[in-house]
């Protein structure tokens, strides 16, 4: 099962952020209650604090039979992990065939990123190359340069660019950059402008080519996220 996308149809995703098995089981109950609103799961492994329970939790998550992105978010991109944590989490989960894709940050050293991508591709995982600017939305030229550089990475199957909107105009510029990119390239791209100014990017991003919109179960994992059921309803209305 690979992540597959249709132009103009944004899929919904939620982030699992459990620290241990009990957390995981509680979140899985919520997911089952809201499963109709969820297309994709993301497992934020940088929150995990119980190494001995990792594979047990993984089997429970995999049993949901939803496409799963494995993510280790480092402090560089607003998460809790270090670059050294990638292999610690990804290696055993890939070996156990948990999930369909791994997230690799663009800020990782190129050699490490390539080695991790190679590990994933050998087991038929997709690689989501991501970048998160937790301060601003860069100027238009920088946005385009970033997207072109990520597109040119031969290890990347999917792309994700998140910026921080300091005004509604920032969101408009990111959506325009998304549209320009997706008209030129076939590689699936997900973008979002974080903050309250960027909520529109999560609702209308699909009309500009964005592939995934992230909502939340209980607590937002990024500023400006909407509850997953509300998000699914808005997307369904807009994409009808």
UniProtKB/Swiss-Prot annotation:
Residues binding 3-dehydroquinate, per UniProt: 15, 42-44, 73, 202, 221, 225
Keywords of this entry: Amino-acid biosynthesis, Aromatic amino acid biosynthesis, Lyase, Schiff base
Molecular function terms, GO-annotated: 3-dehydroquinate dehydratase activity
EC number annotated for this UniProt entry: 4.2.1.10
Pathway: Metabolic intermediate biosynthesis; chorismate biosynthesis; chorismate from D-erythrose 4-phosphate and phosphoenolpyruvate: step 3/7
One example of a Gene Ontology biological process annotation: aromatic amino acid family biosynthetic process
Keyword Lyase attributed: yes
Catalytic activity: 3-dehydroquinate = 3-dehydroshikimate + H2O
UniProt cross-references to SUPFAM superfamilies, sorted A to Z: Aldolase
Enzyme class at the top of the EC tree: lyase
Active-site residues (renumbered): 132 (proton donor/acceptor), 160 (schiff-base intermediate with substrate)
Function as written in the Swiss-Prot or TrEMBL entry: Involved in the third step of the chorismate pathway, which leads to the biosynthesis of aromatic amino acids. Catalyzes the cis-dehydration of 3-dehydroquinate (DHQ) and introduces the first double bond of the aromatic ring to yield 3-dehydroshikimate.
Self-association state and partner proteins as the record states: Homodimer.
NCBIfam families: aroD
PANTHER family: 3-DEHYDROQUINATE DEHYDRATASE
Family: Belongs to the type-I 3-dehydroquinase family.
Name this polypeptide is given: 3-dehydroquinate dehydratase
The species this protein was found in: Latilactobacillus sakei subsp. sakei (strain 23K) (Lactobacillus sakei subsp. sakei)
Gene encoding the protein: aroD
């Amino acid at each position: 099962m690979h992540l597959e996308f249709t132009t103009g149809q944004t899929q919904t995703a939620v982030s699992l952020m459990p620290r241990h098995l009990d957390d995981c089981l509680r979140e899985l109950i919520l997911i089952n209650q809201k499963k109709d609103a969820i297309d994709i799961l993301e497992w934020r492994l940088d929150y995990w604090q119980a190494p001995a329970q990792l594979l047990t939790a993984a089997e429970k998550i995999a049993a949901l039979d939803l496409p799963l992105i494995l993510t280790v978010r480092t402090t560089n991109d607003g998460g809790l992990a270090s670059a050294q944590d990638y292999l610690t989490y990804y290696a055993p989960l890939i070996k156990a065939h948990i999930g369909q894709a791994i997230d690799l940050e663009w800020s990782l050293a190129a050699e490490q990123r390539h080695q991790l991508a190679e590990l994933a591709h050998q087991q038929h995982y997709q690689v989501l190359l991501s970048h998160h600017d937790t301060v601003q939305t860069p100027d238009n030229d920088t946005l385009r340069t970033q997207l072109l550089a990520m597109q040119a990475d031969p290890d990347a199957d999917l792309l994700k660019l998140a910026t921080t909107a300091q005004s509604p105009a920032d969101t408009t510029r990111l959506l325009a950059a998304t549209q320009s990119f997706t008209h030129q390239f076939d590689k699936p791209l997900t973008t979002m402008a974080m903050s309250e100014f960027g909520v529109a990017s999560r609702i209308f991003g699909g009309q500009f080519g964005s592939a995934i919109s992230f909502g939340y179960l209980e607590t937002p994992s990024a500023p400006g996220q909407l509850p997953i059921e509300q998000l699914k309803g808005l997307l369904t209305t807009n994409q009808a």
